[in-house]
């Protein structure tokens, strides 16, 4: 739709009314990354282009929606037009690269991915990978019991095969960090940076994949295409049961949903923000109906995202069979609805939600079509807007089940100021209530006056700990031994003469290069018998 004009098209076709023709580019043969399924995205080869109606064709996708369509193109040499972009001609085994301005590629350390996995294990139990840095590859375990990955760092681990001109990949053949049919496994104290694909996947049903743990790890810049991934297409995926995801940090992600880790998940003490940038719909902590029983979601900081914070999902109305999730002591701010509670028999207590709400209620305890949450418990929460509707007021949509107005702070009915105004210093992560505030007096929210729990990793991720980019010239004074590729930052010692008595003394020199030149001393009187015509300094020796 463009103004008053509508341009209809169906699955397998896309109309770009202005962009393609203005570019003068024929996309036939390129790969389109197509977000045409709301929270699902696919890659497809473009099979034809009609410049008359600005449309291109591709093989149909499995779950096409009628709105919110976005795409970008890859896979043709003509698309390279910005420094840093590259294209691999798979047929001719040739790599094309446009370097940054002023950079000579022959003088740089340019590396390319040559293998998918740096480590693979099948039927190996109690294996430990420790203190290993993975660059442009990752690890994979299959049929493993009690395997551990710890204190390891992965740069460019998961990736796609689009650079090989392969579109629409089989989700089971993606080159991603994964565990298949493995239980009791642990990933801890590690970092995952820059992926084109999920950060990590655990495959297998409840009896094949259970009691797996991801803890105290850092995830950044995860999935810049969000395409061709399994299931709901999420950032962290587990298909099994009893997974634990705790004390982690995640930020800057593409997929609409972030953490979806199977039946009866435990998600605690995580800090997550800036998520779901490439797809519609979604939630940070996502639970479908069967996954909600015995789910335990607590002590998390979730903020600054246009997605739902924590969602017990499922269809609307009486068909929703999600039951028995416990969600407590979470702080959520600047999110598009902090809590979405669908189903029944849930326990939602001691949560704090405030800030930008993107026109949704902060805590939604959904009652729809005469069904929902009649037996749920909602107490000791603090939020500006709590109701049984996505946007409607508490007066029009009162919360069902066990809900007592005096045991919650709800800005719809309480007029003691916003939740944020009643917190000590939320900008600096002090979410305790101010003494004498309504939240303080009612003992509601995620923090009491003496609480000091903190979400996220117990270690601080710093670039200096993992200087993957840096100066790689051993002669430079800022040479970084751990750098994997050059960032053009090399600084060199100033060489020169460092003797103040020399005539070419350099006061800025840091390294003496042996170049000192000295004044010739001697008799400079031409009438003297020992006159030295080359003398530059008279030494008083004239006779």
Residue ranges and their predicted role:
Residues 120-128, 145-148, 173-188, 202-215, ...:
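Surface-exposed loop/turn motifs in large extracellular/passenger domains
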Residues 1-174, 178-180, 428-435, 440-465:
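Extracellular polysaccharide-degrading/modifying enzymes targeting complex plant/algal/animal polysaccharides
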Residues 465-543:
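Primarily marks secretory-pathway-exposed extracellular/lumenal segments that are disulfide-
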Residues 99, 123, 131, 136, ...:
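Residues on the solvent-exposed faces and adjacent turns
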Residues 246, 252, 259-261, 268, ...:
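Core solenoid repeat modules with strong leucine/isoleucine-rich periodicity
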Residues 302, 318-430:
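Predominantly extracellular beta-rich ligand-binding scaffolds that present long acidic/polar faces
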Residues 113-118, 135-136, 164-179, 194-206, ...:
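Extracellular beta-strand/beta-solenoid scaffold signature
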């Amino acid at each position: 739709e463009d103004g008053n004009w509508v341009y209809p098209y169906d699955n397998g076709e896309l109309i770009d009314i202005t962009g393609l023709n203005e570019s003068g580019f024929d996309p036939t043969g390129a790969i389109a990354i197509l977000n045409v399924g709301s929270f699902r995205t696919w890659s497809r080869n473009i099979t034809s282009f009609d410049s008359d109606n600005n449309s291109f064709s591709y093989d149909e996708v499995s779950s096409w929606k009628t709105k919110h369509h976005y795409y970008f193109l890859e896979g043709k040499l003509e698309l390279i037009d910005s420094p840093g972009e590259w294209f691999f001609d798979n047929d001719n085994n040739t790599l094309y690269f446009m370097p940054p301005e002023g950079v000579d590629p022959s003088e740089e350390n340019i590396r390319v991915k040559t293998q998918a996995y740096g480590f693979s294990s099948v039927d190996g139990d109690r294996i430990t990978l420790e203190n290993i840095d993975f660059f442009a590859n990752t690890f994979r375990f299959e049929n493993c019991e009690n395997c551990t990955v710890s204190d390891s760092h992965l740069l460019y681990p998961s990736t796609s095969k689009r650079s090989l001109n392969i579109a629409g990949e089989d989700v089971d053949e993606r080159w991603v960090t994964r565990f298949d049919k493995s239980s009791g496994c642990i990933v801890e104290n590690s970092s995952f940076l820059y992926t084109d694909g999920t950060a990590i996947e655990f495959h297998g049903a409840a009896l094949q994949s259970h009691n797996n743990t991801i803890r105290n790890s850092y995830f950044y810049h995860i999935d810049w295409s969000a395409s061709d991934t399994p299931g709901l297409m999420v950032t962290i995926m587990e298909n099994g049961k009893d997974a634990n995801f705790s004390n982690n940090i995640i930020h800057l992600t593409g997929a609409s949903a972030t953490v979806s880790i199977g039946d009866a998940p435990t998600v605690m003490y995580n800090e997550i923000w800036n998520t779901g940038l490439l797809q519609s719909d979604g939630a940070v902590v996502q639970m479908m109906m069967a996954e909600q029983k015995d789910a335990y979601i607590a002590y998390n900081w979730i903020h600054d995202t246009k997605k739902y914070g924590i969602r017990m999902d499922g269809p609307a109305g009486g068909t929703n069979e999600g039951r028995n999730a416990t969600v407590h002591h979470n702080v959520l701010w600047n999110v598009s609805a902090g809590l979405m509670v669908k189903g029944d028999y849930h326990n939602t207590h001691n949560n704090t939600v405030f800030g930008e709400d993107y026109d949704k209620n902060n805590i939604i305890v959904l009652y729809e079509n005469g069904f929902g949450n009649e037996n749920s418990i909602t107490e000791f929460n603090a939020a500006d807007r709590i109701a049984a509707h996505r946007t409607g007021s508490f007066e029009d949509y009162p919360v069902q089940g066990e809900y007592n107005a005096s045991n919650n702070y709800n800005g719809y009915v309480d007029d003691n100021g916003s939740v944020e105004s009643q917190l000590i210093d939320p900008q600096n992560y002090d979410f305790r209530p101010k003494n004498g505030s309504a939240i303080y007096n009612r003992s509601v929210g995620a923090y009491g006056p003496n609480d000091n729990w903190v979400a996220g990793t117990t270690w601080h991720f710093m670039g200096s700990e993992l200087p993957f980019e840096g100066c790689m010239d051993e002669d430079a004074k800022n040479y970084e031994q751990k750098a994997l590729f050059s960032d053009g930052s090399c600084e060199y010692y100033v060489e020169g003469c460092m003797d103040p008595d020399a005539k070419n003394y350099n006061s800025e020199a840091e390294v003496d290069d042996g170049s000192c030149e000295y004044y010739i001393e001697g008799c400079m009187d031409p009438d003297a018998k020992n006159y030295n015509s080359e003398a530059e300094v008279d030494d008083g020796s004239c006779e």
